[in-house]
C-alpha cells in the first residue's frame, strides 16, 4: 500500500483531498493539527510516531526530523543499496508528501508582532520534508500548493504522473521555500526597512538592501533628513545612474523617474545652475544628484528652492551648514564609481526579468555622419550630452540639448513625433547649436520634418529603420546634420 504524509498549516481542501487519497488506497500519516482535522472528519490516519517509533517532543518542534521519515522520502527506489538500507533499518517508503508551512509572512505582517511570535512561526520540519521530497521527485510526489490537489488526484487516478509534472511540482516547492526563507531573512535582517508606504499611501512597501557598497543607494551615507520614501528611492536611483555617466562636473534633476534638467559646467555650481535653468519649474520638489563635492556656492543656489533629496560624493562643511537649515531635505553622500557588471531586476506577474544595465558608452568615434552636412564642434558636444541623457528618459524619448545642458525633454510618449513636439514646446532656447537626440530610430521622416519646423539643425538617432534613407534624404533636403549611433536606448 502506498503511503502519504500530510502536514499542513493551510488546511484548505485537505479533507476532500485526503478522502480521495484513501479511495486510491493510500495509507495516511500525519502530525499535530492536521492529524486531528482528519480524525475529526472520520478519515483513517496514523501518527508519524508509528513511522519513527519516537514521540513528538518540545511542543511539536521535533516530530518529523527523523531518519525513518527522511530515509523513506529520500531513498532512490532504483538503487539496491538504498533499498537494502531501508530493509536493514526498518524504514518504510513514503510516496506522497503534502506539506505547507507555518504562516510566517502572515504573522510578521502584524505590526504588533513580537520577535518570539516570529521565531515560533519559523517552520523547520516542513521545509526539510519539502526539500527532501522535491529532491527525490522521480520517486516521491510533492505537493505544497492546495491548488494542485485536484490535478494530482486526477493524475493518480489515470496513472499519468509523468516526470514533467513531477518536475513542475518540484520547482514549485523550491520556489516556495526560497520565498519562505527570504521572508525570514527580511524580517530579522538590518538590510530590510519598512517604508511609510509604497508608490501610493494604500500600498505597503519595504526597502531590501542586497548590496550596500558606498557607490550604491543602499550604501549611502545619510547626513541629514527624514527617511527616504519609496518614490524618493526610485527617483534617487534614476538620478544617481544618470549623473554617473558624466566625467566633467554635472548635475541631474529627476522627477517621476525622468530627468527634467541636466547641466554640465567647469565647476559644480555652474553645472547645477545649468540644470536648474533647463527646467526651473519641474525641478521643484525633485531629486538632484551632483558628481562633485557640493561647495558653498552650489549649496546657496540649492537652498533657494524646494528639493526632496540631494546626492553628492561629498558636502563641504559650509554647504552642510546651509542645507541642514532645511529640516526635511535629505542629504546623501554616495561615491560616484560606476559598477561595470550591474544587473537590474524587474518583477512581472509570476516572475521577474533580469538584464544588464544600459552602461554602453557611445563616443563620437563610434558614431557616423549619414548626411551631407557635418555637425559643428558645438553640435558634437551637444550630441554627446544629449545621447547620455536620452537613455535615462522613458521611451519614446526625445532630448534637446546644447553643449552645456538639456533644453527640452519629451518623455514616455506612444509615438516619437509626439515626444519631439513636447520637447520642442518645453525648450528654453532654440538655436543652431541645439541638437535633437532620439532613443529609437525614425520609422518615417516626420520627426525630421518636426525638427526642421522648430529650427533644429542637428539630429542624433540610432538608425536601423528600413526607411532610414527617407529620413536621411529629408535631412539633406533641409540641410540638417544627422548622426547615427547604431545603438538603441529604449527605456520602459
From Swiss-Prot:
GO cellular component: cytosol
Catalytic activity: (6R)-10-formyltetrahydrofolate + 5-amino-1-(5-phospho-beta-D-ribosyl)imidazole-4-carboxamide = 5-formamido-1-(5-phospho-D-ribosyl)imidazole-4-carboxamide + (6S)-5,6,7,8-tetrahydrofolate; IMP + H2O = 5-formamido-1-(5-phospho-D-ribosyl)imidazole-4-carboxamide
GO biological process terms, semicolon-separated: 'de novo' IMP biosynthetic process
Known EC number: 2.1.2.3, 3.5.4.10
Cystine bridges: none
InterPro entries: AICAR_Tfase_dup_dom_sf (IPR024051), Cytidine_deaminase-like (IPR016193), MGS-like_dom (IPR011607), MGS-like_dom_sf (IPR036914), PurH-like (IPR002695)
Record-level Gene Ontology MF annotations: IMP cyclohydrolase activity; phosphoribosylaminoimidazolecarboxamide formyltransferase activity
Pathway the protein acts in: Purine metabolism; IMP biosynthesis via de novo pathway; 5-formamido-1-(5-phospho-D-ribosyl)imidazole-4-carboxamide from 5-amino-1-(5-phospho-D-ribosyl)imidazole-4-carboxamide (10-formyl THF route): step 1/1; Purine metabolism; IMP biosynthesis via de novo pathway; IMP from 5-formamido-1-(5-phospho-D-ribosyl)imidazole-4-carboxamide: step 1/1
Domain statement: The IMP cyclohydrolase activity resides in the N-terminal region.
Keywords tagged on the record: Hydrolase, Multifunctional enzyme, Purine biosynthesis, Transferase
Protein name: Bifunctional purine biosynthesis protein PurH
Domain of life: Bacteria
Family label: Belongs to the PurH family.
Domain MGS-like: 1-144
Pfam families linked: AICARFT_IMPCHas, MGS
CDD domains the record matches: IMPCH (cd01421)
Organism of derivation: Macrococcus caseolyticus (strain JCSC5402)
Amino acid at each position: 500500500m502506498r503511503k502519504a504524509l500530510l502536514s499542513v498549516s493551510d488546511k484548505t481542501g485537505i479533507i476532500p483531498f485526503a478522502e480521495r487519497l484513501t479511495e486510491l488506497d493510500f495509507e495516511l500519516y500525519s502530525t499535530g493539527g492536521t492529524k486531528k482535522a482528519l480524525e475529526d472528519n472520520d478519515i483513517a490516519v496514523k501518527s508519524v510516531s508509528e513511522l519513527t517509533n519516537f514521540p513528538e517532543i518540545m511542543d511539536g518542534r521535533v516530530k518529523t526530523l527523523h531518519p525513518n521519515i527522511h530515509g523513506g522520502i529520500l531513498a532512490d527506489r532504483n538503487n539496491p543499496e538504498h533499498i537494502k538500507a531501508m530493509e536493514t533499518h526498518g524504514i518504510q517508503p513514503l510516496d506522497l508528501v503534502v506539506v505547507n508551512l507555518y504562516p510566517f509572512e502572515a504573522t510578521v505582517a502584524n505590526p504588533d508582532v513580537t520577535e518570539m511570535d516570529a521565531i515560533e512561526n519559523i517552520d523547520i520540519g516542513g521545509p526539510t520534508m519539502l526539500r527532501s521530497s522535491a529532491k527525490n521527485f522521480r520517486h516521491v510526489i510533492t505537493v505544497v500548493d492546495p491548488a494542485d490537489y485536484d490535478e494530482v488526484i486526477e493524475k493518480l487516478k489515470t496513472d499519468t504522473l509523468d516526470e514533467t509534472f513531477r518536475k513542475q511540482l518540484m520547482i514549485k516547492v523550491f520556489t516556495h521555500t526560497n520565498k519562505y526563507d527570504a521572508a525570514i531573512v527580511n524580517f530579522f535582517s538590518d538590510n530590510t526597512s519598512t517604508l511609510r508606504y509604497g508608490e501610493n499611501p494604500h500600498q505597503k512597501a519595504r526597502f531590501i538592501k542586497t548590496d550596500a557598497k558606498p557607490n550604491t543607494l543602499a550604501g549611502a551615507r545619510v547626513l541629514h533628513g527624514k527617511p527616504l520614501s519609496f518614490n524618493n528611492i526610485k527617483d534617487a536611483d534614476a538620478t544617481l545612474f544618470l549623473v554617473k555617466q558624466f566625467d566633467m562636473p554635472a548635475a541631474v534633476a529627476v522627477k517621476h523617474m525622468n530627468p527634467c534638467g541636466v547641466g554640465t559646467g567647469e565647476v559644480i555650481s555652474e553645472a547645477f545652475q545649468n540644470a536648474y535653468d533647463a527646467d526651473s519649474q519641474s525641478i521643484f520638489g525633485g531629486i538632484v544628484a551632483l558628481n562633485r563635492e557640493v561647495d558653498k556656492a552650489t549649496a546657496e543656489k540649492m537652498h533657494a528652492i524646494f528639493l526632496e533629496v540631494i546626492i553628492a560624493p561629498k558636502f563641504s562643511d559650509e554647504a552642510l551648514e546651509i542645507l541642514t537649515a532645511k529640516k526635511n531635505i535629505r542629504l546623501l553622500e554616495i561615491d560616484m564609481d560606476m559598477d561595470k557588471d550591474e544587473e537590474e531586476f524587474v518583477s512581472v506577474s509570476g516572475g521577474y526579468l533580469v538584464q544588464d544595465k544600459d552602461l554602453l558608452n557611445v563616443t563620437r568615434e563610434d558614431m557616423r555622419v549619414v548626411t551631407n552636412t557635418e555637425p559643428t564642434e558645438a553640435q558634437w558636444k551637444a550630441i554627446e550630452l544629449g545621447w547620455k541623457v536620452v537613455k535615462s528618459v522613458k521611451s519614446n524619448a526625445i532630448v534637446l540639448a546644447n553643449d552645456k545642458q538639456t533644453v527640452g525633454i519629451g518623455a514616455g510618449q506612444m509615438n516619437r513625433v509626439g515626444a519631439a513636439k513636447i520637447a520642442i514646446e518645453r525648450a528654453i532656447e532654440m538655436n543652431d547649436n541645439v541638437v535633437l537626440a532620439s532613443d529609437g530610430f525614425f520609422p518615417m521622416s516626420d520627426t525630421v520634418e518636426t525638427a526642421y519646423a522648430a529650427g533644429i539643425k542637428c539630429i542624433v538617432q540610432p538608425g536601423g529603420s528600413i526607411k532610414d534613407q527617407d529620413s536621411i534624404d529629408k535631412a539633406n533636403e533641409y540641410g540638417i546634420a544627422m548622426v547615427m549611433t547604431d545603438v538603441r536606448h529604449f527605456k520602459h
